UniProtKB/Swiss-Prot annotation:
Transmembrane segments: none annotated. Residues 153-162 have a biased composition (Basic residues). Residues 109-175, 203-223, 257-287 are annotated as: Disordered. It comes from the Bacteria. Residues 110-136 have a biased composition (Low complexity). Residues 143-152, 273-287 have a biased composition (Basic and acidic residues). Belongs to the chlamydial CPn_0623/CT_504/TC_0791 family. This is Uncharacterized protein TC_0791. InterPro entries: GrgA_tf.
Length: 287
């Protein structure tokens, strides 16, 4: 937002560590509240307003219709619980967690010292106003100094907290890795010494008892190669023998086409002879 004349900042309300400010509409409770870390109380004429210090999410609401409440931030609690729970589940050894950690602490000290040096370098730059605009810009300078100090303290605290959590997590993970490697080495050392002990297999029981005596070896039958042509010739000869034995039997009767023709001819001849005999009888009787 841009103003033709900057409003008067009455005070700045900030939340404690682990808490946040909730600016809620007292007349319309269904409206979602604004959850911020700091809020400014400004005055325009005779009316007071709440303005967010974080310019990425700006809002300007009348102070008469809104109320400010301090609520606990749930993110910090969840993060702390997750770290503690993860360490307890994985390691389970309190002695390893209590071991001194030298390297992470040194890195934390270096980060804190660098952040302090940056704050010391930035302070004189912000706090050195131009002499020409010293009188009319006094309120702005005070407001900027106050905001910068508050935000610097919060940034330092957040960096220290994050660096401590990272150092604890790195140290615990390093301890767990060391213990796991030691256990793996301890488990692998007996395997390398006695490789034959682990190599075993279940042998089926013998089919004969020792009291029955040794089993005599069976004579292996010689395997001979069979020629296909010889086997076919043998089958043909056997089939011919079977057919000849069937034909040689006296009880069998053979019906062929020639026998059928001869039987038909004999029947025709007998019928002709009968007709001729009947004709001769008639002629003789007439005479």
């Amino acid at each position: 937002m841009y103003f033709t004349r900057d409003p008067v900042i009455e005070t700045v309300i900030t939340s404690r560590e682990g808490y946040k400010l909730s600016i809620r509409n007292s007349k319309h409770l269904s409206q979602d509240p604004f959850v911020v870390e700091a809020v400014e109380v400004i005055r325009l004429g005779g009316t007071s307003f709440f303005r967010n210090c974080d310019h990425s999410k700006p809002f300007l609401v009348p102070a008469a219709d809104y109320e400010v409440m301090e609520v606990r931030d749930a993110k910090i609690n969840l993060k702390a619980v997750g770290l503690d729970r993860g360490v307890k589940i994985v390691s389970g050894r309190e002695a390893l967690l209590k071991m001194p950690r030298v390297a992470p602490v040194a890195s934390v000290q270096e980060e804190s010292s660098s952040s302090l040096e940056e704050g010391i370098i930035e302070d004189p730059v912000v706090a050195t106003p131009s002499p020409a605009s010293a009188a009319p810009m006094s309120k702005k300078e005070k407001r900027k100094e106050f905001k910068n100090e508050k935000w610097k303290e919060k940034k330092k605290q957040g960096r220290r907290r994050n660096s401590k959590e990272i150092a604890d997590a790195v140290g615990s993970s390093q301890d767990m890795i060391d213990t796991i490697t030691e256990e793996c080495l301890q488990e692998s050392s007996p395997e390398e010494r006695d490789p034959c002990e682990r190599r075993f297999a279940l042998i089926p029981p013998p089919t004969r008892l020792i009291s029955e005596g040794p089993e005599e070896p069976k004579e292996s039958q010689p395997v001979t190669a069979v020629d296909l042509n010889e086997s076919l010739n043998a089958l043909v000869s056997e089939s011919c023998d079977v057919i000849e034995s069937i034909l040689a039997d006296e009880d069998t009767v053979i019906f062929t086409k020639e026998s059928e023709k001869s039987s038909n001819e004999t029947q025709e001849l007998s019928s002709h002879s009968l007709e001729e005999a009947s004709v001769h009888d008639r002629i003789s009787s007439e005479e």
